[in-house]
Regions:
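A short acidic, helix-capping loop that chelates divalent metal ions and anchors anionic groups
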Residues: 39-41, 72-77, 112-119, 205-210
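A short helix->loop->beta-strand "cap" motif at the edges of active sites that frequently abuts
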Residues: 60-62, 101, 143-144, 229-234
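N-terminal pre-domain/capping segments
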Residues: 1-68, 72-91, 262-264
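Active-site beta-loop-alpha junctions enriched in small/polar residues
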Residues: 9-13, 34-38, 69-71, 109-111, ...
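Charged helix-capping and loop-helix junction motifs
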Residues: 45-52, 81-90, 122-130, 181-188, ...
Length: 264
């Protein structure tokens, strides 16, 4: 058996968080509960659904990782927008605290959204990000539960903050592959701090979060081999949002694990 656990997202089926967890339980060990836009009336689970999520967690020995809102701009040059982003994250933290999450995934953009321009002052960017992250930690969270996601820039730019605050990393290998980055070197660099590896394929036209069928087989095998050889005990999340993509990805992962076991 691999040292790592397998995860799925709460958007595999067009249904509620709990309905997804109920169908995925027994097939994966962790569910990444997605709260991309929690501002609306249906943006967060109600008390009954939260209780159901607790019951499912306990019955199936699951863990939950929480993906915080995409709109939270934690290093914005606009102080009001940055404060609003912190408040968005904390709203999700408060709503899901009863689930005892094993990780909280955070986006720290260069500006106010992904693919924005590089900030003119790197140190000021780090200071703004650190201020927001300290506020989130001060809300009663263990620093290592906060996972800064590797986005569209070199995370070494933010590494002093991550290391200084003793945070963790969510390594989106799907995006690294999409962007043509040296995923193996980046994985080796950050794996000791990585609690989650997010994995998905990219179609030829550039659409990501697709089936792992779109990842070259030798690359997919190399990733699983690297995680296994490192005895990494985090969560490998199949970060796809559709049933067929999930089924095909899970089947491919199982095949790779069997191949690696047979060769060992």
């Amino acid at each position: 058996m691999p040292p790592f656990r397998t995860g799925a997202t709460s958007f595999v089926y067009p249904a509620s968080w709990a309905a997804n967890v109920e169908r995925l339980a027994g097939r994966v060990e962790d569910i990444e509960l997605l709260f991309f836009a929690p501002q609306g009336p249906d943006g967060l689970p109600d008390p009954a659904e939260l209780q159901r999520l607790v019951e499912l967690r306990d019955r199936h020995a699951l863990t939950y990782s929480i993906h915080t809102p995409l709109s939270a701009s934690l290093a914005s040059e606009d102080d009001a927008r940055r404060a609003a982003g912190v408040a968005e994250v904390l709203r999700v933290v408060d709503a899901t605290r009863c689930l005892s999450p094993s990780a909280y995934v955070l986006h720290v953009y260069w500006g106010d959204a992904e693919h924005g321009p590089r900030p003119s002052d790197d140190e000021a960017f780090r200071q703004r990000a650190a201020r927001s992250l300290r506020q989130i930690i001060a809300h009663g969270l263990a620093p290592e539960l906060l996972c800064v996601e590797y986005l569209d820039y070199d995370l070494d730019l933010l590494a002093p903050v991550i290391e200084g605050l003793e945070l963790s990393v969510a390594l989106d290998v799907g995006h690294l592959l999409r962007d043509g980055r040296d995923w193996a070197a980046i994985l080796a660099r950050y794996l000791p701090r990585t609690r989650l590896v997010q994995w998905h394929g990219t179609q030829p036209g550039g659409r990501d979060h697709q089936s792992l069928e779109h990842v070259p087989r030798e690359v997919a095998r190399a990733l699983v081999e690297q995680l296994t050889a490192a005895n990494w005990d985090g969560v490998l999340t199949l970060e796809v949002f559709e049933e067929q993509a999930f089924e095909r990805s899970l089947a491919l992962l199982s095949q790779l694990q069997q191949e690696i076991t047979c060769r060992a």
